[in-house]
Amino acid sequence: MSDPGLVGVVGAGTMGSGIAHVFARSGFRVALCDVDTRFLERAMGQIRTNLGREASKGKLAVAEIELALERIVPTTERKDLARSAVVVEAAPERFEVKREIFRALDAILPEEAILASNTSSISITKLAAETRRADRVIGMHFFNPVPVMALVEVVRGMATSDATFAAVKELSERLGKTPVEVNDAPGFVSNRVLMPLINEAAFAVMEGVATVEAVDQVFKLGMAHPMGPLTLADFIGLDVCVDILRVLHEGIGDPKYRPCPLLVRMVDAGWLGRKAGRGFYRYEG
C-alpha cells in the first residue's frame, strides 16, 4: 500500500531538484532518486540555497529550511520509491530514457500509485502504454525555476482517468501552483507555441537579419516580454530546446519545427546556454 505522505522524484537535475523543493516545502516527504550521486549532492545544495533565498525574502521561516531539507531523502535506489503515492519523473527529454523509467517504476509501485511525468513535449499516452496503469499516468509539466513559477500544465493522456486528473489538480494546488488542464499533444500548449518563437529567433541570427542582442531587444522593448527569446533559450538550455523541437517536428510533421541548424551546431559545440557558461551569450561564475 502506498504512503500518502511520500512522493518520489526521479531525476535530480534542475527540474527534479526544483520539484523536490516544492514538495518538501509543502510538507511532503520526498525520495529524490538519481543514478549519479554527484547530481544528488548538487541538487541538495541547490535546494538549500533556494530555501535560504526564500527565507531571506520573508517567504519562509528560517526554522523551516532544515525541516524541509530533512524531508528529502536522496537515493540512487529506485526501490526507495516503492511506497510512494505519487512519483514525478523528471529525466532528460528522450522517450527511450523515460520509457525505461516508467517500466521500472510500474513494476515496483503499489497498484493505486500515480505515475506523473514532467515532460515538456513527449506523449503522455505513449508513456502510459508502457505501463499496466495507463489510467493513473498523467503529465505534471512544471516550469523553471520551479519554486518561483506558478503554473503546472496537467496533461491528460488518452487513458488518464478523471480521478487521477482530480487528484493531481488538487496536489498541484497544495504546492501553491495553478494547474491548467491540457490534452495530450506534442509540446502541449507551452512548447508548441514557445519553441517556434525561439527557433525563428535563431534563424534570424543565422541568416544575418539581426544580432542576438537586437532580436532580444525587439521582444523586450517592443512586445513587453521580460526577456528576449534567445536569453530565454539560454536559460532553458539549448540542448533542451533542440530535443523539444525534434519531438515537435516528428510528432506534428510541420517543417516550422525543424531545429535551426545554428541551434544544432551550438549544442554540438557544447554551448548549451547559461548552465554551460556559453550559449547565445557568455556567462561567468
Segments predicted by a language model, with ranges:
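Rossmann-fold dinucleotide-binding core
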Residues: I114-D184, F188-R192
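Rossmann-like NAD(P)-binding element
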Residues: R38-R42, R53-L115, I122
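Structural/interface elements that position substrates and couple domains in central-metabolism enzymes
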Residues: A31, A63, R174-K177, N191-I198
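NAD(P)+-binding Rossmann beta1-loop-alpha1 motif at the extreme N-terminus of oxidoreductases
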Residues: M1-N50, K57
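NAD(P)-dependent Rossmann-like dehydrogenase/reductase catalytic/cofactor-binding core
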Residues: S2, A166, E173-D184, F203-E207, ...
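Helix N-cap / loop-to-helix initiation motif
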Residues: D36, A61, S161, A210-A214
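Short glycine/serine/threonine-rich phosphate/pyrophosphate-binding segments
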Residues: G16-G18, K98, S120-I124
